[in-house]
């Protein structure tokens, strides 16, 4: 796979698709789900970021950023440069360094989806999670406590699509099962 740099971080791209992985445990079997970003379809419209803010009832204030961010990305191939957009949120890393970095144990893996979720009740606002995150994802609200994408794990538990996937008008974001990519995941229809 190609290796690219964006937002100061290293990304592995398989063709032009980018995956944020998580596992959903079902009995003894483990399914691997992903929010798949097709870079060729993303036009940086921001619908995913707005849907995320609406889903989480989050208003971005000065000095803050949304849970999902849109970045420009330069891709160099065969001595030519192309520009793509990258819709980036928490990557829900398998061995999430933010969990290890948090001295207050505010971050954890959801046992059903393996998404990195949080409860800021004990958050001391030390920014250790943000410093540990290789993608720089955790940010901090007006109260000084950590906030980030939780993968809409409550929606996923209910059989719904994550808000960003549902709202994407160009089909750039999809919820996929990496173990059975040809099989459609029976979820609610997206807005496109």
Question: Model-predicted segments: where are they?
Answer:
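Short, Lys/Arg-enriched N-terminal segments with co-localized hydrophobic residues
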Residues: 11-29
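Flanking helices and flexible, charged tails adjoining ferredoxin-like Fe-S electron-transfer domains
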Residues: 4, 23, 64-94, 99-100, ...
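Ordered, amphipathic secondary-structure segments that act as subunit-interaction surfaces
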Residues: 92-106, 110, 115
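N-terminal cysteine/histidine-rich coordination modules
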Residues: 31-40, 53-69
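A positional/architectural concept
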Residues: 49-50, 54-55, 72-76
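Aromatic-flanked redox-active Cys/Sec active sites in thiol-based oxidoreductases
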Residues: 38-39, 104, 120
